[in-house]
Amino acid sequence: MACAEQDKLGQAFEDAFEVLRQHSTGDFQYSSDYKNYLAFINHRSHIRGNSNSYGVQPAEEPIYNWRTVINSATDLYFEGNIHQSLQNIPENQLVQPALLQQKGGKGRKKLRLFEYLHESLCNPEMASCIQWIDQTKGIFQFVSKNKEKLAQLWGKRKGNRKTMTYQKMARALRNYGRTGEIIKIRRKLTYQFSEAILQRLSAPYFLEKEIFYSQYVQPDQGYLSLNNWNANYNYTYANYHELSHPDC
């Protein structure tokens, strides 16, 4: 990569974060990795600018892929805003959302039943086992003839050796009723997610991230188009605040 192109890349990287910072609702905190990256870009620009005076030929420049840079940047932006929106929820109602779980490794959190149920509700192939009654209110119902099948699939998903039954699963649902994540509705096999849980499970993180990313990076494009960024950023930012919870 030419020196001029590398300089433009470093400047564009800083500009991207400046835009995110200006449009965020609170202080936008850079991680140490991004601070180190900015320092690295600036340092290399300084060395290149003075290398000719020492008779040193600049080394071959590594190619930085904007997919990785922008993908990480939007992770920080959207996760930061979700974190801020959760600060107003009472502590006893907070449940770590699946979208913020660690991706693999020993620190990965186990999938919880209410997460699995919401996932199944969002899966058309599971409509014979569980269905929405009122999605906006988080009300759902188990299909009587296939409720055992859903329970068995849940047991397999957990890695249980013994077959999971609906009776055992219903016991866990009653425990949720005591803690407030899911409550029983006065209707057969019908339950309701709490508002706080429904908001976390329905958070439009991945949808918005895809919109944010696709506005200025084409499918086969590994670099950033600043013209596309300027033309589409305001549109994308407005969509983030206007879109309601997407349909599953």
Curated annotation (Swiss-Prot):
Subunit and interaction comment: Binds DNA as a monomer.
Xref: Pfam families: Ets
Its job: Controls the development of red pulp macrophages required for red blood cells recycling and iron homeostasis. Transcription factor that binds to the PU-box, a purine-rich DNA sequence (5'-GAGGA[AT]-3') that can act as a lymphoid-specific enhancer. Regulates VCAM1 gene expression.
Gene name linked to the record: SPIC
GO terms (BP aspect): cell differentiation; regulation of transcription by RNA polymerase II
GO cellular component terms, A-Z: nucleus
Species this chain originates from: Bos taurus (Bovine)
DNA-binding region coordinates: 111-194
Subcellular location: Nucleus
Descriptive protein name: Transcription factor Spi-C
UniProt keyword terms in alphabetical order: DNA-binding, Nucleus, Transcription, Transcription regulation
A single MF term (Gene Ontology): sequence-specific DNA binding
Lineage: Eukaryota, Metazoa, Chordata, Craniata, Vertebrata
